[in-house]
């Protein structure tokens, strides 16, 4: 439009309240504003809530399919909250997540923002990484959320967030999802004492640590001697942890 401005040989009369005459030069001035209003109206109609829940719209670059749990692809996100306010995130990455759940038709995802975001508001983490849980194996869609709420009621120190939303991915409605915390070490998540790295001969290696009882042996993992239970060490990271810390954890768990 900028390279081909409209040109008229005669004036155009537009019927308005004042019955005024709009010249071609005036039209050139107001046309960008009119196009902006049309664009805003179209955007408002495009990003609306599907139900009474918030709706998350994610569009990947070139509508690329999400096929990997390891490789992120770029995307944008529009978050329509309960009050129909729209938050726009124009630079994020998304990939698959989960173990057995990744093989189901309704897949879970992990999103990573360019900067830390307080997606769920006050009292929740400000972080780059968040998860979209599909709850595909749960017909009620509520077991994970109920477990989190029960943990809060019991006074557990950390309970993953449980915010239900509708997900639209590349224009396709995917159904009900749950925005949840990526389980990692930070305030409002797993808030443990982080160790000073690199370690010295006098460093205190008694904690904190972040371990997971896992059914899958991946990452920095060991198996308990008595019950043969896989334990995964999430913190310190695999590239940061040293031999003395690994041995301390194994001895502590198997005592």
Predicted regions and their residues:
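Bacterial Sec-dependent N-terminal signal peptides
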Residues: 1-7, 13, 17-46
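Phosphate/dinucleotide-binding and metal-coordinating scaffold of catalytic cores
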Residues: 45-255
């Amino acid at each position: 439009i900028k390279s081909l401005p409209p040109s008229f040989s005669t004036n155009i009369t537009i019927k308005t309240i004042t019955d005024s005459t709009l010249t071609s030069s005036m039209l050139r001035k107001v046309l960008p504003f009119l196009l902006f209003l049309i664009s805003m109206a179209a955007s408002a109609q495009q990003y609306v809530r599907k139900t009474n829940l918030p709706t998350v719209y994610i569009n990947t670059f070139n509508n690329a399919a999400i096929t990997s749990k390891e490789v992120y692809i770029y995307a944008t996100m529009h978050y329509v909250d309960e009050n129909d306010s729209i938050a726009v995130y124009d630079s994020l990455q998304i990939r698959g997540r989960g173990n057995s759940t990744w093989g189901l038709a309704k897949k879970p995802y992990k999103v990573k923002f360019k900067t830390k975001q307080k997606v769920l508001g006050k009292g929740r983490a400000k972080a780059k990484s968040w998860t979209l849980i599909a709850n595909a194996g749960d017909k009620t869609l509520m077991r994970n959320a109920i477990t989190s709420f029960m943990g809060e009621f019991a006074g557990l120190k950390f309970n993953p967030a449980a915010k239900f939303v509708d997900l639209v991915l590349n224009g396709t409605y995917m159904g009900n999802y749950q925005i949840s915390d990526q389980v990692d070490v930070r305030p409002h998540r797993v808030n443990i004492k982080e160790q000073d790295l690199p370690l010295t001969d006098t460093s205190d290696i008694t904690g904190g640590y972040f371990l997971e009882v896992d059914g899958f042996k991946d990452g920095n993992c060991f198996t308990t001697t008595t019950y043969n239970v896989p334990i995964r060490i999430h913190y310190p990271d695999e590239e940061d942890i040293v031999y003395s810390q690994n041995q301390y954890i194994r001895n502590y768990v198997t005592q």
